[in-house]
């Protein structure tokens, strides 16, 4: 079957395959977090040292595609890769757990602060007190998500050799 072009990816019979080459760890992380939040995507992250061709990077990412929705499989394709792939995948597994336990109210609250609102602005937008906003963020695991996001960013940056 020949794929039909659809902009970001290729669509095959009953299966979507979206591929994106990103130049930095933060862009990759933001994309993965959006897909994890949705919960319906099997995600593959291929990390190379940047010395290979675009085709090699695409092949690495394709090999990394997970088999289950809400899962991130990671392959680090470089000379000195040790446990980096497993560490990154474990970080995403923990963050996915936090994201999937969120209530509607928790998703609403975290979405506003993720977009740059402070807690007071987000509370006003939702029509709740700042104390209620703080409680929603705590119940939603916002501090854990922030810590996990920073950890994932650090690990991906190191694995890509960008922090060296």
Residue map of PLM features:
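Short, Lys/Arg-enriched C-terminal cap helix and immediately downstream tail that follows
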Residues: 141-156
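Key DNA-contacting residues within the recognition helix of helix-turn-helix
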Residues: 134-135
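Short, Lys/Arg-enriched anionic-surface-contact patches
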Residues: 84-107, 153-161
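Short alpha-helical "packing" element that flanks the helix-turn-helix/winged-helix DNA-binding module
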Residues: 106-113, 122
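Single conserved hydrophobic/aromatic residue that forms the stacking wall/gate
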Residues: 2-12
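Short alpha-helical "recognition helix" segments of helix-turn-helix
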Residues: 119-126
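Compact structured core domains
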Residues: 23-98
